[in-house]
Amino acid sequence: MILSHVISDAALAITGVGAFWHFFGHLPFYNRLLWGFFLLTISLAAIAGTVQFAGYTGLELLYESLQTLASTLGISCIVVAVWAFVMNRTMQLMSFGLTLVVGVFLFVVMLLPDVRVFRPVVSSLGILLVMLLGVFGLMRRVPNALWVVIAVMLSAIATKAVSFADLFNPIDFYHYILAFSLLAFGKAVQK
């Protein structure tokens, strides 16, 4: 059992659920669902990580699958959700469904053993698109678009957690910075 990892993963899970509950309730239904798929897939992976770091090793495959789900379906949902935020669009069933189909397709493909190595590429490209959309939102003078840029910058810093290994435990650092990133995404849509 690694207590610090249990605490940091639990903090990430609580932050994801709490941010969704607190910040996203006023959004239109399908927009809220897109944000929810992003936040809650991360939270589900964090819950599985909490259990795994607590010493229960039976969830390793589930934990790996949930991480893949967050980096495929979650990323595709955040890209479309941020696009809708920047363009001030209300998502319809067709675009929502298409986003889910693309995300689930990416998830299934990334589960294949030969393709699994490309999972970081998919999430990196998705986060890059979110950053570009955030900058586009700043150019369009969208209120709170700066929070999208801050959230993406925090996500990028979290992925470089190994660089801070001398100062912090990389796994805990990743969890806490990603939790701050989720809060920044919440601040972006806050009224």
What does each of the following model-derived ranges do?
Residues 1-6, 54-66, 89, 111-122, ...:
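Membrane-helix interface and helix-disruption motif detector
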Residues 136, 140-191:
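C-terminal transmembrane-bundle signature of multipass membrane proteins
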Residues 27-42, 88-98, 140-150:
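Membrane-interfacial loop-to-transmembrane alpha-helix junctions, especially the N-terminal start
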Residues 9-21, 71-84, 126-135, 175-190:
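Hydrophobic cores of alpha-helical transmembrane segments in multi-pass inner/ER membrane proteins
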